[in-house]
Every structure is written in structure tokens, then in C-alpha cells.
Curated annotation (Swiss-Prot):
It is an enzyme of class 2 (transferase). InterPro entries: MenaQ_synth_MenD, MenD_middle, THDP-binding, Thiamin_PyroP_enz_TPP-bd_dom, TPP_enzyme_TPP-bd. It comes from Vibrio cholerae serotype O1 (strain ATCC 39315 / El Tor Inaba N16961). One of its GO terms (biological process) is menaquinone biosynthetic process. Keywords: Magnesium, Manganese, Menaquinone biosynthesis, Metal-binding, Thiamine pyrophosphate, Transferase. It holds the Pfam family TPP_enzyme_C. The gene is menD. This is 2-succinyl-5-enolpyruvyl-6-hydroxy-3-cyclohexene-1-carboxylate synthase. Coiled coil: none annotated.
């Protein structure tokens, strides 16, 4: 048989990508590079794929993360060899903690060119370490490696990903030449053993994984006073959890990432009140749906409650990752949340006594927080707390993406989001890649998007504003500029070094950045001005509007301390 390595590289890539398509991949994110040519050209030729491109691999990885987050489907990423691969690590580390499924296809030099001084060659095998769910180190394409082996190897790592979530890494060495106009007919004998697969549309290996739908055996643990905590979930999952709490008559404490709220909102503040905490301590059961709680006060209460050993702690999530940082006794249910709720309620409410309304008095504290906050921030004064309060009513038909650091904490404390699709990166909680992730979310959902993030976060991901130039739906990015890391005003860092080593003020604004990337820009002057900008852009605008809100560095922390002091006086 004649040999054409470039053609063989292409056939190998075609089979790999076709199998990924049959396993649910429809979105492929591509960065430029020559060594990845076989993968890039075959992805482009496969009509089942929608391609997204970006010149910055770090941003590309986060865009893929956003696509996977919003679509809840695996998303492929194609990059060339060398440091391009290393730039994907932040997004992969995030996906490890939050479960988004990335299929990372990294082109590589063949083995004989690694570690010998060849250009653009680093050790890529195992580069992502424990941050990936599974890895597959492919050999260079050769006819003595059967395509049936390639297919079953892909199916194995993808089945593991389907079960556990997170990213998989498939390293793909391609010898040169990489370009050819040769006739593929010379490789028909090589393709023949997988002819039946080529003629069908299903995966080579079909893995049928069981669903956990049984009624929990420990149902008696739910016959008492309970608390329901809702963490980072899709809106549909969160609404199932809310249905459970309502049926039980238990207090419902909702993280803003869930997109729902309740009468017990603003708990990060009222949990600091001794009487409120004392009443919540009467709980004899905690049922938590989803992970990644923002509120430090709620996490502290949960840790202290678990330490008493006086009740059952149930944790329900679709994936089996451990979510138990205080290592308490726990009943963990790995299943679809709606399945668990339906199973429990069908048995739990069959004429059995319930502790309905045992913690309704706590709603008084939530109302007090809301009233105090509105009293302080009902004027036209523009502040970060005012933005968080306003978010409850603002652009309610748009998807919401929350940045990390200070803004997500303010939203957690002061907002009461209900019925919103909320997205965030609260796995590793880094401030990198937030704009790119939001771009991926919108590309998947094709809906208007409102994003809130801080100035340092935007500086970190400035390159990714290029991804926001032509969104499918109107987009508003709100950057709160407090000139550095104002979050450190809430932390006990050394006061002498706070500004120089923690806050790191930069003295910049974002007008020229918006201009460079072709985005509309406006600096909001008052709260009413901000509200008008947001609503008019969503009603009549197109493209992306960057709204900058400048605030004094210590203002937010001062406001929180004032409200906390007044709440204690109640």
C-alpha cells in the first residue's frame, strides 16, 4: 500500500471527530495552529459541528466552558502543540470542580520529537494531571493501529466523562507532512474493518448507564424540622428543589447561582444575628441540592450544625463528586434532582406528619434586611450595593452571568433573584476567563445576557472582549470599577500592605478598551441613568454595551458593616 501521512492524519481525525459527534458533541472551539491542521480541517468539514474560533487559547478554553455550562453537553476544544495546550489548564481546572464536560483535543509532535530540542514541543502527556476525568494518549496515526481500537478508546473515556463529568484530554500526535491533496482511495482497505460503523449513525460502543431513581431508604430522617439549601444548579433543577421545600414547609436558603429565591433571602446578613442563628440551630435535618455556596455565613453555620451530630445531612447532585469540606457524616444521593424530589414526596407526604412552618419567624429577619437596605439605597446614588439590590428587578428576561470576588457576594447578600437563569464560575472561583465564559453561555443559549463583574476581573480577561463584538442577542456588561481589589476590605489582611500588595489600584477605566474591541460604552452617573441604559439597550439596542460604574474603593465594605450593625440592633 502506498503511504500518505497527511491523508492518514486526516482520516484518523475524521473518525475521531465523527465518533465525538455521535456521542453528543455539536460545538467545537478552535484556536489557530499548523500541527492541529488534521483536526481543524476535519471539524470544519463535519456538518454536525458548529465552530467557534479565538486566537487566545486561555479564552478559548473558557468560551468552551461557557458553551458546556449552558448547553449541558460535551464541547470539544482543538489547539496546536506547545504552550497553547498549557493555556487550557484554568478552564479545565474549573470544569473539574463544576462538572462541565470539555473534550480537549491537543495536537502534538510525534513521540520521537518530544524532549530532544524540536520546535514547539513540550511534554503534553499528563499535563492536566488530576484536573481531568480521563486521559487518552494516542499514538501517531499508522495503519498498524486499527481504527476499531481508536473508536473503542474514545468511547471508553467518553463513557467515563458521561458518568463523572469534568474534562477529558485526548492527545493527538501528528507526524509531518500535515497537508496533502492525495487520493483517499489508497486507504480504503484500512477503513474496511469499520465499514458497518461508517454506514450507521450510532456510536461504535453504546454504554447504557443506570439511572438512580429509587426512593431513598433513609426517608425517616426527613420526618422532623429541616432546612433546604440550594446551591449552584440550573433553573429547572432549582425549581424542583423549591417544590420540595414548599411541600415540606421548611425554610429555603437559595444561593444566587440557583436563579431562585425565597422569603428567607439575605441570610448572609441575618445569620449574623444571634437570635436568628439560635432558631435555625433547631434544625434536625439539612437537605442540600447542588454545591458551590457563595455565602460564608451559611457555610459556617452548616459546618457548626454538622459538628453537633444532631441530625441528618443529605446532599443531592447529578454527579458523584464529594462536596463535604468539613467531612461530616452525610447521605449523598447521585441522581437527577427532580427524580429524587418526586420519589421522596410520593412517599414522604402520604399522610405523614410534617413540621410545616417551623422556621417561618426567620422571614422577619429577611424582611428587615431588605427594608434597611432599601432605606439606605433608594435614592439615585450609584453604588455596588445599589446595583445588587436593583438586580432583583433589572432585565428579568435576560440571562445573568455573575463575576467572582466582590460582586457575587453583594448579589448573594442583597439580591432576591427568582426565575432567572444564572451562570458563574464558582468552582475554583477564579477571576480569569469570565468574559470568555459568558460569551460561551450566550452562544449556546442565544438569549440576551446581562453580565456583572469587577474591574480586576475585566482587566484579566480583556482579550476576550473580542468574543463579544457580534453577539446574537443584545448584551450588557456591567463593570464595577473600585480601582482594584476592594474585596480585601472585607478580609483581615494587614492594613499596612492592603493597598500595595492586595488591592493593587490601577487607576484605569475601560472607555478605550471598549473602543478597541468595537463595543458601545457608557459610564453610568446615577442609579436611574444606569437603569435606563440597561433597559434601553435590551429593548432597542444591538451588540454589546459596556457600562462602567465607578465607586470609591472602600464604599461597599462600609455599607455592609453599617447594615450589619443596624441589624444587630433589632
Amino acid at each position: 500500500m502506498n503511504r500518505d501521512q497527511a491523508l492518514l492524519n486526516r482520516l484518523w481525525s475524521r473518525v475521531l471527530l465523527e465518533e465525538l459527534s455521535r456521542l453528543g458533541v455539536t460545538q467545537v472551539c478552535v484556536a489557530p495552529g499548523s500541527r492541529s491542521t488534521p483536526l481543524t480541517l476535519e471539524a470544519n468539514a463535519n456538518t454536525a459541528f458548529t465552530l467557534h474560533t479565538h486566537y487566545d487559547e486561555r479564552g478559548l478554553g473558557f468560551m468552551a466552558l461557557g458553551l458546556a455550562k449552558a448547553s449541558q453537553q460535551p464541547v470539544a476544544v482543538i489547539v496546536t502543540s506547545g504552550t497553547a495546550v498549557a493555556n487550557l489548564l484554568p478552564a479545565i481546572a474549573e470544569s473539574k470542580l463544576t462538572g462541565e464536560r470539555l473534550v480537549v483535543l491537543t495536537a502534538d509532535r510525534p513521540l520521537e520529537l518530544v524532549g530532544c530540542g524540536a520546535n514547539q514541543a513540550i511534554v503534553q502527556s499528563g499535563i492536566f494531571s488530576s484536573h481531568v476525568t480521563a486521559s487518552l494518549e494516542l499514538p501517531s496515526p499508522a495503519i498498524h493501529h486499527p481504527l476499531s481500537w481508536l473508536l473503542t478508546s474514545i468511547d471508553e473515556v467518553m463513557a467515563r466523562q458521561a458518568l463523572l463529568g469534568g474534562s477529558v484530554h485526548i492527545n493527538c500526535p501528528f507526524p509531518e507532512p500535515l497537508y496533502s491533496a492525495g487520493d483517499e482511495a489508497i486507504y480504503q482497505p484500512y477503513l474496511q474493518p469499520v465499514q458497518r460503523w461508517r454506514e450507521q449513525a450510532r456510536p461504535y460502543t453504546q454504554v447504557h448507564q443506570g439511572l438512580v431513581q429509587s426512593v431513598p431508604a433513609a426517608i425517616d430522617g426527613l420526618l422532623t424540622k429541616g432546612v433546604v439549601i440550594v446551591g449552584s444548579l440550573s433553573l429547572q433543577e432549582a425549581q424542583a428543589a423549591k417544590r420540595f421545600a414548599k411541600a415540606m414547609g421548611w425554610p429555603l436558603l437559595c444561593d444566587p447561582q440557583s436563579g431562585i429565591s425565597s422569603q428567607w433571602a439575605h441570610f448572609d446578613l441575618w445569620l449574623q444575628h444571634p437570635k436568628a442563628r439560635e432558631q435555625l440551630n433547631q434544625a434536625q435535618c439539612v437537605v442540600q441540592f447542588g454545591s458551590r455556596i457563595v455565602s460564608k455565613r451559611l457555610l459556617q453555620w452548616l459546618e457548626a450544625w454538622c459538628a453537633t451530630g444532631l441530625g441528618e445531612y443529605h446532599y443531592i447532585a447529578p454527579h458523584s463528586a464529594r462536596n463535604n469540606p468539613w467531612h461530616a457524616m452525610q447521605q449523598q444521593w447521585v441522581c437527577e434532582i427532580s427524580h429524587w424530589v418526586d420519589a421522596v414526596l410520593s412517599k414522604r407526604l402520604a399522610g405523614q406528619h410534617t413540621q410545616q412552618g417551623w422556621a417561618d419567624e426567620l422571614t422577619h429577619y429577611a424582611q428587615s434586611v431588605r427594608q434597611l437596605a432599601q432605606l439606605h439605597f433608594s435614592s439615585s446614588s450609584l453604588s455596588e450595593v445599589a446595583l445588587a439590590l436593583d438586580l432583583t428587578e433589572r432585565a428579568t428576561q435576560a440571562d445573568l452571568f455573575l463575576g467572582n470576588s466582590l460582586i457575587v457576594r453583594l448579589v448573594d447578600i442583597f439580591s432576591a433573584l427568582d426565575g432567572r437563569e444564572v451562570f458563574s464560575n464558582r468552582g475554583a472561583s477564579g477571576i480569569d476567563g469570565l468574559v470568555a465564559t459568558a460569551s460561551g453561555v450566550q452562544r449556546a443559549r442565544q438569549k440576551p445576557l446581562l453580565m456583572l463583574l469587577g474591574d480586576t476581573s475585566l482587566l484579566y480577561d480583556l482579550n476576550s472582549l473580542a468574543l463579544m463584538r457580534n453577539p446574537a442577542q443584545p448584551t450588557v456588561i456591567v463593570v464595577t470599577n473600585n480601582d482594584g481589589g476592594a474585596i480585601f476590605d472585607l478580609l483581615p489582611v494587614p492594613s499596612e500592605q492592603r493597598e500595595a500588595l492586595y488591592q493593587m489600584p490601577h487607576g484605569m477605566d475601560f472607555a478605550h478598551a471598549a473602543s478597541q474591541f468595537g463595543l458601545a460604552y457608557c459610564a453610568a452617573q446615577t442609579l436611574e441613568h444606569y437603569q435606563t441604559l440597561v433597559e434601553e439597550h435590551f429593548a432597542h439596542g444591538a451588540g454589546t454595551l459596556l457600562i462602567e460604574v465607578k465607586t470609591p474603593p472602600q464604599q461597599a465594605s462600609m455599607h455592609i458593616k453599617q447594615l450589619t450593625s443596624q441589624l444587630h440592633a433589632l
